[in-house]
């Protein structure tokens, strides 16, 4: 995920305002803070430990909601509301799984993250 999001650059800032290693937007960060009750500055997203903590927290919420890593990756990239609308469209979804992601950027993102997960898993097995 981090390789795909920021190429391991903790100071990365996207054109959309996503920050740090896992490219978390301010809005997502504030939403996550509202769920866990912490009160810390958005600038802490440039701190690798904080960024990974909240990025993985967000991934865990998405996995709890969707139960499929490909859907989690799509929601992380395109947003939950967009993915929820895709999941209700039979041309995009089959048996509750995204099979035809309409945004090429998101489809490519899901493929890149999935490939990276496979590659890093192989490295961990060594």
Model-found features: residue ranges?
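Catalytic glycan-binding domains that act on GlcNAc-containing polysaccharides
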Residues: 2-126
């Amino acid at each position: 995920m981090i390789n795909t999001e920021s190429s391991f650059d903790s100071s990365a800032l996207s054109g959309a305002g996503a920050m740090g290693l896992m490219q978390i937007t301010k809005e997502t960060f504030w939403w996550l803070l509202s769920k866990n009750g912490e009160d810390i500055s958005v600038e802490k997203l440039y701190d690798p430990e904080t960024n990974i903590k909240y990025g993985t927290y967000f991934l865990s919420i998405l996995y709890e909601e969707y139960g499929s890593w490909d859907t989690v990756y799509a929601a992380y990239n395109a947003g939950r509301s967009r993915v929820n609308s895709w999941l209700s469209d039979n041309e995009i979804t089959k048996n509750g799984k995204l099979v035809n992601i309409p945004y090429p950027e998101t489809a490519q993102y899901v493929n890149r993250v999935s490939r990276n997960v496979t590659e890093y898993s192989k490295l961990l097995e060594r």
